[in-house]
Amino acid sequence: MTRENELLRKILRGENEYWEELIGMYYEDIYRYCIYHAPDRNLAQDAVQETFLKVIRYFPNYRDRGKFRAFLYKVASNVCTDQWRKCREEEIPEDTVYLETGYARSEDDIRFLERVRALPEELREIVYLKYAQELTMREIAKVLNIPMRTVQSKLRRALGILKC
């Protein structure tokens, strides 16, 4: 049994003191996800907090219906989407993601980012979830609420575009 599953079982039994450890396991990943999707850094931090509050609130509805990680990313996705609707602003610059993660940019990085940025949103989201967040195809399908075969074909299409 993984540590995540152990914590989930304890929380399901009402041992709420284990939330802190479970949240700690995913905090950085969800923060990076929200930085990528939120209009600015402060809203990303708000989105992370709101994500975990909603996960705690709606956890009884989860009840081991698939991977917890996919459930968590789905909640984060919904929170960020709600923020975008409220702000009605353009997508955050990719520079923010690099500054947050401390990556240095090379010319190749810049060219690649420009090509990724040029992808349609639906393809860009799948590429980001697959390679930046390292979600499985099945987890991406759950997060985006689309069939796994659709995820596979869209990822294949995105990679084909990026190779050109």
Task: Locate each region found by the language model.
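Structural recognition of an alpha-helix C-terminal capping motif at a helix-to-coil junction
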Residues: 32, 46-53, 66-78
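Arg/Lys-rich amphipathic alpha helix in sigma70-family domain 2
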Residues: 60-64, 74-94
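C-terminal flanking helix
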Residues: 27, 31, 52, 120, ...
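DNA-recognition helix of helix-turn-helix
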Residues: 77, 81, 123, 132, ...
